[in-house]
Regions:
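Charged, amphipathic alpha-helical segments and their flanking helix caps
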Residues: 1-34, 44-130
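Helicase-core coupling region on the C-terminal RecA-like lobe
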Residues: 38
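Residue-level detector of conserved, well-ordered beta-strand and adjacent loop positions
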Residues: 41
Length: 130
């Protein structure tokens, strides 16, 4: 059995859990996201050590799930963002993921595109296997 990795067992699992949401899903920061988009990025602190030993390493990993929609009309963009956030929250299994807060929306520029974005804080426990 191959060793577990955070890329596969955590970010990949989050991406899979979000597969039913109508958005492009990125498990790393894209150069130019296609909206609507969900981007999974490490938060700070990224890793909180829980068990560190010769045979077991267990950490709490903290992520930001960034929901992004096009910003053409303020009212429509906010409605689209709220719908995307509710879809994301519904797709993530609360027993596996710890969801804490959804940050207020903000406008951001990515390249030449203006986006309305909001961050969702998520934590998950990960144990390294051999």
């Amino acid at each position: 059995m191959p060793a577990s990795t955070i890329a596969t067992d955590v970010r990949g699992a989050i991406k899979t859990a979000l597969a039913g949401v109508s958005a492009n899903i990125y498990d790393s920061v894209p150069e130019a996201p296609i909206v609507p988009a969900i981007i999974v990025i490490p938060d700070s602190p990224y890793m909180e050590l829980e068990v560190l030993g010769k045979s077991t390493t267990r950490v709490k990993l903290n992520y930001t799930i960034t929901a992004c929609v096009a910003y053409f009309s303020n009212a429509a963009a906010l409605d689209n963002l709220e719908q995307l956030i509710i879809s994301i929250l519904g797709a993530l299994n609360a027993s596996k993921y710890e969801l804490s807060v959804v940050e207020r929306p903000s406008v951001t520029e990515v390249g030449t595109t203006t986006l309305l974005v909001s961050d969702i804080r998520l934590s998950v426990r990960y144990e390294q296997t051999a």
